[in-house]
UniProtKB/Swiss-Prot annotation:
Localization per Swiss-Prot or TrEMBL: Nucleus
Complex and partners: Efficient DNA binding requires dimerization with another bHLH protein. Binds DNA as a homodimer or a heterodimer (USF1/USF2).
Region (Leucine-zipper): 271-292
Any one GO MF annotation of this record: DNA-binding transcription activator activity, RNA polymerase II-specific
Region (Disordered): 1-26, 171-209
Bias (Basic and acidic residues): 190-209
UniProt-listed SUPFAM superfamilies: HLH, helix-loop-helix DNA-binding domain
Position of the Glycyl lysine isopeptide (Lys-Gly) (interchain with G-Cter in SUMO2) cross-link: K306
Positions with biased composition (Polar residues): 1-17
Species whose genome carries this gene: Bos taurus
Protein name: Upstream stimulatory factor 1
Main location: nucleus
C-alpha cells in the first residue's frame, strides 16, 4: 500500500509531507515512513494532519521511542531515539483523541487537540549517535505537556497501532460498567436434616403399617381355611405362629391325602379294565349258550332249565 502525499498550510507557506510505504508480508521489519525536512517545519502548533489511504482503508504505523529532549524541540540529532522492532507484539493501546477525520482538518483547534512532532530521518537510530535508513522518521504524539503514548517502554520493545476513523476507535479510558445486583444474594436454604429424617421415618412407618395389615389379613384367611383353627381361638389370643404351624401341618396332610388318592385312583382304573374284560367274556358265554340250545331243539331234545332255588 503506497502512502499518499499530504499538504499542510501554515502561516509561512505550503509544506509537502511525503509518507512512506507501510510494512508488508514481504518485509516484516519495515515500518511506516513519514519524512520531512526538519522539526522546525511546523512552527504553528495549530497545524493538523490526517493519515489516509487511497481506498480509505486502515493505516498501520509504528511507534518510535523519543527522548525528552526531542519532545521539547531540541536540536536535531541530540538525544537517543530508538525504534521498536516490527517482529515483537504487545498489547494494543488505543489513544483517545489521537486521530481526526477529514472534516476535522478544517475546524479550529482547541487546547485539548492533539499535536504531532516530527523528527527527520537523521535523528532516528538504534542507539545514541546511531542512524537508520534515510527513509525512517520518528513520529511522536503529544497533548499539551503530557505524552499520550502512555508510559515509556524500554528499547527493543514496541507495538503497532491501527489508524482508523474516530467512530471506530475504542475509547481507552472507558470501562464497561457492570449492573449492580438487584437483590442481595442469599444462599439456597436447605431444610434441616431432622425434618427430612422425620419425613422419611413417617413414610417408612406408613409402609410398615400397610405391610403388617396385609400379613394379618392373610393369617386371618388361613385361620378360616384350617379346620382346627377358628375365630374364637384367634380372638382368645392364639399366636400367629401357632396359626402358621397348623397351616403347615394341614398342607402336609393335604399333600399326603392327595398322594394316597392318586394311588387309589390308579387301582380303580385297573379294576375298571378288568371289569370290562370280564363283561366281554360273559357276553361271549351267553352267545355260545344260545347256540347250543338252538342245536338241541333242532334235534328234538327238550332242554329244561332248572333254577338253583328248585
Amino acid at each position: 500500500m503506497k502512502g499518499q502525499q499530504k499538504t499542510a498550510e501554515t502561516e509561512e507557506g505550503t509544506v509537502q509531507i511525503q509518507e512512506g510505504a507501510v510494512a508488508t508480508g514481504e518485509d516484516p521489519t519495515s515500518v511506516a515512513i513519514a519524512s520531512i525536512q526538519s522539526a522546525a517545519t511546523f512552527p504553528d502548533p495549530n497545524v493538523k494532519y490526517v493519515f489516509r489511504t487511497e481506498n480509505g482503508g486502515q493505516v498501520m504505523y509504528r511507534v518510535i521511542q523519543v527522548s525528552e529532549g526531542q519532545l521539547d524541540g531540541q536540536t536535531e540529532g541530540t538525544g537517543a531515539i530508538s525504534g521498536y522492532p516490527a517482529t515483537q507484539s504487545m498489547t494494543q493501546a488505543v489513544i483517545q483523541g489521537a486521530f481526526t477525520s477529514d472534516d476535522a482538518v478544517d475546524t479550529e483547534g482547541t487546547a485539548a487537540e492533539t499535536h504531532y512532532t516530527y523528527f527527520p530521518s537523521t535523528a532516528v537510530g538504534d542507539g545514541a549517535g546511531g542512524t537508520t535508513s534515510g527513509s525512517t522518521a520518528a513520529v511522536v504524539t503529544t497533548q499539551g505537556s503530557e505524552a499520550l503514548l502512555g508510559q515509556a517502554t524500554p528499547p527493543g520493545t514496541g507495538q503497532f497501532f491501527v489508524m482508523m476513523s474516530p467512530q471506530e476507535v475504542l475509547q481507552g479510558g472507558s470501562q464497561r460498567s457492570i449492573a449492580p445486583r438487584t437483590h442481595p444474594y442469599s444462599p439456597k436454604s436447605e431444610a434441616p436434616r431432622t425434618t427430612r429424617d422425620e419425613k422419611r421415618r413417617a413414610q417408612h412407618n406408613e409402609v410398615e403399617r400397610r405391610r403388617r395389615d396385609k400379613i394379618n389379613n392373610w393369617i386371618v384367611q388361613l385361620s378360616k381355611i384350617i379346620p382346627d383353627c377358628s375365630m374364637e381361638s384367634t380372638k382368645s389370643g392364639q399366636s400367629k405362629g401357632g396359626i402358621l404351624s397348623k397351616a403347615c401341618d394341614y398342607i402336609q396332610e393335604l399333600r399326603q391325602s392327595n398322594h394316597r388318592l392318586s394311588e387309589e385312583l390308579q387301582g380303580l382304573d385297573q379294576l375298571q379294565l378288568d371289569n370290562d374284560v370280564l363283561r366281554q367274556q360273559v357276553e361271549d358265554l351267553k352267545n355260545k349258550n344260545l347256540l347250543l340250545r338252538a342245536q338241541l331243539r333242532h334235534h328234538g331234545v327238550e332242554v329244561v332249565i332248572k333254577s338253583d332255588s328248585n
